[in-house]
Protein backbone atom coordinates (compact mmCIF):
# COMPACT_ATOMS: atom_id res chain seq x y z
CA UNK A 1 0.00 0.00 0.00
CA UNK A 2 1.23 3.46 -0.85
CA UNK A 3 2.16 5.71 2.07
CA UNK A 4 0.35 8.60 0.38
CA UNK A 5 -0.97 9.65 -3.00
CA UNK A 6 -3.17 12.24 -4.70
CA UNK A 7 -6.52 11.59 -6.38
CA UNK A 8 -9.68 13.45 -7.39
CA UNK A 9 -11.82 14.44 -4.41
CA UNK A 10 -15.09 13.02 -5.74
CA UNK A 11 -17.04 12.37 -8.91
CA UNK A 12 -18.19 15.54 -10.63
CA UNK A 13 -18.21 17.62 -13.79
CA UNK A 14 -17.24 21.08 -14.96
CA UNK A 15 -17.99 22.84 -18.24
CA UNK A 16 -16.04 25.43 -20.20
CA UNK A 17 -16.74 26.97 -23.62
CA UNK A 18 -13.97 27.55 -26.15
CA UNK A 19 -14.76 29.07 -29.57
CA UNK A 20 -18.44 28.13 -29.14
CA UNK A 21 -17.61 24.46 -28.47
CA UNK A 22 -18.74 23.07 -25.11
CA UNK A 23 -16.16 21.00 -23.25
CA UNK A 24 -17.61 19.13 -20.27
CA UNK A 25 -15.04 17.43 -18.05
CA UNK A 26 -16.32 14.47 -16.04
CA UNK A 27 -14.03 13.12 -13.30
CA UNK A 28 -14.29 10.06 -11.11
CA UNK A 29 -12.16 8.03 -8.75
CA UNK A 30 -11.57 4.47 -10.00
CA UNK A 31 -9.58 1.54 -8.64
CA UNK A 32 -9.68 -0.86 -11.61
CA UNK A 33 -9.66 -0.61 -15.38
CA UNK A 34 -13.14 -2.12 -15.43
CA UNK A 35 -14.42 0.71 -13.23
CA UNK A 36 -12.81 3.22 -15.58
CA UNK A 37 -14.41 1.66 -18.65
CA UNK A 38 -17.80 1.53 -16.93
CA UNK A 39 -17.51 5.23 -16.08
CA UNK A 40 -16.56 6.09 -19.66
CA UNK A 41 -19.49 4.10 -21.05
CA UNK A 42 -21.83 5.76 -18.58
CA UNK A 43 -20.80 9.22 -19.81
CA UNK A 44 -21.05 8.14 -23.45
CA UNK A 45 -24.57 6.90 -22.81
CA UNK A 46 -25.54 10.15 -21.10
CA UNK A 47 -24.03 12.24 -23.90
CA UNK A 48 -24.81 9.94 -26.84
CA UNK A 49 -25.41 12.93 -29.14
CA UNK A 50 -22.10 14.67 -28.34
CA UNK A 51 -19.50 15.16 -31.07
CA UNK A 52 -16.83 13.39 -28.99
CA UNK A 53 -16.39 11.75 -25.59
CA UNK A 54 -12.62 11.55 -25.13
CA UNK A 55 -11.07 9.84 -22.14
CA UNK A 56 -7.94 9.20 -20.09
CA UNK A 57 -7.16 7.40 -16.86
CA UNK A 58 -4.30 6.49 -14.54
CA UNK A 59 -4.63 3.49 -12.23
CA UNK A 60 -2.37 1.58 -9.83
CA UNK A 61 0.32 2.19 -7.25
CA UNK A 62 2.97 2.58 -9.94
CA UNK A 63 0.62 4.07 -12.56
CA UNK A 64 0.97 0.80 -14.47
CA UNK A 65 -2.37 1.33 -16.21
CA UNK A 66 -2.47 4.46 -18.36
CA UNK A 67 -4.90 4.83 -21.23
CA UNK A 68 -5.97 7.68 -23.51
CA UNK A 69 -8.65 7.73 -26.20
CA UNK A 70 -9.31 10.48 -28.77
CA UNK A 71 -12.79 9.20 -29.72
CA UNK A 72 -12.61 10.52 -33.26
CA UNK A 73 -10.58 13.67 -32.68
CA UNK A 74 -7.28 13.87 -34.63
CA UNK A 75 -4.76 11.43 -33.14
CA UNK A 76 -2.98 12.76 -30.06
CA UNK A 77 -5.07 15.93 -29.71
CA UNK A 78 -7.48 14.89 -26.95
CA UNK A 79 -6.82 11.78 -24.85
CA UNK A 80 -3.07 12.30 -24.58
CA UNK A 81 -3.19 15.93 -23.37
CA UNK A 82 -5.88 14.86 -20.89
CA UNK A 83 -3.64 12.07 -19.63
CA UNK A 84 -0.70 14.45 -19.37
CA UNK A 85 -2.66 16.70 -17.01
CA UNK A 86 -3.46 13.74 -14.74
CA UNK A 87 0.20 12.72 -14.72
CA UNK A 88 1.54 16.24 -14.15
CA UNK A 89 -0.83 16.62 -11.20
CA UNK A 90 0.56 13.28 -9.92
CA UNK A 91 -2.93 11.79 -9.63
CA UNK A 92 -3.65 8.10 -9.20
CA UNK A 93 -6.84 6.06 -9.61
CA UNK A 94 -8.47 8.87 -11.57
CA UNK A 95 -10.53 8.78 -14.77
CA UNK A 96 -11.41 11.80 -16.91
CA UNK A 97 -13.91 12.01 -19.76
CA UNK A 98 -14.27 15.22 -21.75
CA UNK A 99 -17.48 15.57 -23.72
CA UNK A 100 -17.33 17.97 -26.64
CA UNK A 101 -20.26 19.54 -28.41
CA UNK A 102 -18.87 21.13 -31.57
CA UNK A 103 -19.71 24.81 -31.89
CA UNK A 104 -18.91 25.30 -35.56
CA UNK A 105 -15.38 26.70 -35.28
CA UNK A 106 -12.44 24.38 -35.91
CA UNK A 107 -9.65 24.72 -33.36
CA UNK A 108 -6.80 23.01 -35.20
CA UNK A 109 -4.46 20.46 -33.63
CA UNK A 110 -2.79 22.91 -31.26
CA UNK A 111 -6.09 24.41 -30.22
CA UNK A 112 -7.57 20.99 -29.49
CA UNK A 113 -4.57 19.97 -27.37
CA UNK A 114 -4.89 23.14 -25.31
CA UNK A 115 -8.67 22.86 -25.03
CA UNK A 116 -8.76 19.28 -23.80
CA UNK A 117 -5.90 19.86 -21.39
CA UNK A 118 -7.54 23.02 -20.06
CA UNK A 119 -10.86 21.22 -19.61
CA UNK A 120 -9.31 18.57 -17.35
CA UNK A 121 -7.13 21.07 -15.49
CA UNK A 122 -10.04 23.39 -14.72
CA UNK A 123 -12.25 20.42 -13.90
CA UNK A 124 -9.75 19.30 -11.25
CA UNK A 125 -9.53 22.82 -9.86
CA UNK A 126 -13.32 22.99 -9.62
CA UNK A 127 -13.99 19.52 -8.17
CA UNK A 128 -10.89 19.34 -6.01
CA UNK A 129 -8.00 17.02 -5.23
CA UNK A 130 -7.22 15.16 -2.01
CA UNK A 131 -4.12 13.57 -0.56
CA UNK A 132 -4.81 10.10 0.81
CA UNK A 133 -2.35 9.27 3.58
CA UNK A 134 -1.99 5.79 5.06
CA UNK A 135 -2.60 5.87 8.81
CA UNK A 136 -2.71 3.35 11.64
CA UNK A 137 -5.65 3.61 14.03
CA UNK A 138 -4.30 3.33 17.57
CA UNK A 139 -6.62 2.29 20.40
CA UNK A 140 -5.88 3.66 23.86
CA UNK A 141 -7.97 2.42 26.80
CA UNK A 142 -7.74 3.96 30.26
CA UNK A 143 -9.62 4.62 33.47
CA UNK A 144 -12.03 7.59 33.37
CA UNK A 145 -9.76 9.57 35.67
CA UNK A 146 -7.50 10.01 32.61
CA UNK A 147 -10.27 11.24 30.28
CA UNK A 148 -9.59 14.97 30.47
CA UNK A 149 -5.81 14.75 30.42
CA UNK A 150 -5.59 12.31 27.50
CA UNK A 151 -8.19 14.17 25.42
CA UNK A 152 -6.54 17.56 25.97
CA UNK A 153 -3.05 16.25 25.24
CA UNK A 154 -4.21 14.44 22.08
CA UNK A 155 -5.97 17.53 20.72
CA UNK A 156 -2.81 19.59 21.24
CA UNK A 157 -0.49 16.94 19.76
CA UNK A 158 0.51 16.20 16.17
CA UNK A 159 -1.73 13.12 16.28
CA UNK A 160 -5.33 13.25 15.08
CA UNK A 161 -8.04 12.15 17.50
CA UNK A 162 -10.64 10.15 15.57
CA UNK A 163 -13.20 9.18 18.17
CA UNK A 164 -13.81 8.61 21.89
CA UNK A 165 -15.76 5.57 23.09
CA UNK A 166 -17.35 5.49 26.53
CA UNK A 167 -17.87 2.07 28.10
CA UNK A 168 -16.35 0.36 31.15
CA UNK A 169 -13.20 2.35 30.38
CA UNK A 170 -12.74 5.30 28.06
CA UNK A 171 -11.17 4.42 24.70
CA UNK A 172 -9.52 6.83 22.30
CA UNK A 173 -9.11 6.08 18.59
CA UNK A 174 -6.26 8.08 17.10
CA UNK A 175 -4.87 8.36 13.57
CA UNK A 176 -1.11 7.83 13.65
CA UNK A 177 1.34 7.57 10.77
CA UNK A 178 2.81 4.06 10.59
CA UNK A 179 6.33 5.33 11.24
CA UNK A 180 5.10 7.11 14.39
CA UNK A 181 3.31 4.21 16.10
CA UNK A 182 6.19 3.37 18.45
CA UNK A 183 6.66 7.02 19.35
CA UNK A 184 2.92 7.34 20.00
CA UNK A 185 2.90 4.29 22.29
CA UNK A 186 5.89 5.56 24.26
CA UNK A 187 4.38 9.04 24.55
CA UNK A 188 1.00 7.71 25.73
CA UNK A 189 2.61 5.32 28.21
CA UNK A 190 4.62 8.16 29.72
CA UNK A 191 1.59 10.47 29.71
CA UNK A 192 -0.51 7.98 31.72
CA UNK A 193 2.30 6.66 33.91
CA UNK A 194 1.87 3.27 32.29
CA UNK A 195 -1.81 3.09 33.26
CA UNK A 196 -3.23 2.82 29.73
CA UNK A 197 -3.65 -0.10 27.37
CA UNK A 198 -2.43 0.71 23.85
CA UNK A 199 -3.15 -1.48 20.84
CA UNK A 200 -2.57 -1.14 17.12
CA UNK A 201 -5.69 -1.17 14.97
CA UNK A 202 -6.31 -1.31 11.24
CA UNK A 203 -4.57 0.60 8.49
CA UNK A 204 -6.75 3.10 6.68
CA UNK A 205 -6.41 6.07 4.36
CA UNK A 206 -7.11 9.52 5.73
CA UNK A 207 -8.08 12.14 3.14
CA UNK A 208 -7.09 15.78 3.22
CA UNK A 209 -8.01 18.43 0.66
CA UNK A 210 -5.05 20.04 -1.08
CA UNK A 211 -5.03 23.45 -2.72
CA UNK A 212 -1.92 23.04 -4.81
CA UNK A 213 0.16 20.13 -6.06
CA UNK A 214 3.64 20.69 -7.40
CA UNK A 215 3.46 19.43 -10.97
CA UNK A 216 6.03 17.05 -12.43
CA UNK A 217 8.13 18.19 -15.35
From Swiss-Prot:
This is IMPACT family member YvyE. Pfam families: DUF1949 (PF09186), UPF0029 (PF01205). PANTHER family: IMPACT FAMILY MEMBER YIGZ (PTHR16301:SF20), IMPACT-RELATED (PTHR16301). GO terms for biological process: regulation of translational initiation. NCBIfam families: IMPACT_YIGZ. One of its GO terms (cellular component) is cytoplasm. Belongs to the IMPACT family. InterPro entries: EFG_III/V, Impact, Impact_N, Impact_N_sf, Impact_YigZ-like, Ribosomal_Su5_D2-typ_SF, UPF0029_Impact_C, UPF0029_Impact_CS.
Amino acid sequence: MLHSYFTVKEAGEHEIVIEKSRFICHLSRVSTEQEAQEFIQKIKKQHWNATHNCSAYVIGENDHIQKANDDGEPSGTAGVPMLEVLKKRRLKDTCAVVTRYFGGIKLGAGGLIRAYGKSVSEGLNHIGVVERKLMRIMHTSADYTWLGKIENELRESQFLLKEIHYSENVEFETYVEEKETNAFSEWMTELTNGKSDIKEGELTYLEKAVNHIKETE
